[in-house]
Amino acid sequence: TVANLDSIATLLRCSGVDIVALQEADGPSFWSGNFNHVDYLADNGAFSQSVQGMHVNGLGLSYGTALMANLALRDPKAITFDPSLSPVPKGFTVSTVSWPGSPGTDVDIVSVHLDFASKSIRRQQADELIEAVRRRGRPVIIMGDFNTGWEENSTVQHISRALSLTAYSPEEAGLETFPTFGERLDWILVSPGLSFRSYHVLPDPVSDHRSVIAEVVLEDTAKATRLD
């Protein structure tokens, strides 16, 4: 509803984040009320830039992953995972940003949504993501709904190991993002040379998942960017 979008926009404005990653972000469709929810959030959340990938299109539905930012989003790309893997398509959106205060330092930002039902499908989707990140060849921050926790051999561990990424205190209690089952399904992963200055799961019930806000530092300059 518009009221819920307004609540999200208010939360984003108050948080002061530089970059936002969205999953199940609606475009214009019968289901969404025939307007683009990402454009609405960008306008009302005070973000100058947005990119969106529609991974589901049809039957009155149009939604996918998206990024919003107050930094220039360059070299954008949206990839829908192999549709033969799952009846409900998932995918990711990626763009490049220049790190604030550090000219010449480019970082890829990814918003990803993995399958909710099957570990084997998540693993295959993860391999598509890993290959795409490697091809782009930049440091990366991956944010999104991985639909899995940090258990041994989970998909989020697989991605982290394959790309040498770090998660914030992956086994710490109190960072659950899916309160219905008390699970941590939403993650932020960062490349070497980047580190977390702060990390919070917000209590605001703006969706069935809780929002995550992190402040990420470029280690050699201590220049920080706030992410949601």
Task: Walk through the language-model features, giving the residues of each.
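Beta-strand-turn-beta hairpins that frame and shape the catalytic cleft
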Residues: 61-63, 69-75, 87-111, 194, ...
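Active site of divalent-metal-dependent phosphoester/diester hydrolases
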Residues: 29-34, 49-69, 86-88, 147-213
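N-terminal, active-site-proximal structural segment of metallo-dependent hydrolase catalytic domains
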Residues: 1-44, 57-59, 127, 218-228
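Surface polyanion/phosphate-binding segment centered on an Asp-His-Pro turn
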Residues: 142-143, 149, 211-228
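Sec-exported extracytoplasmic/periplasmic mature domains
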Residues: 13-17, 42-47, 73, 131-138, ...
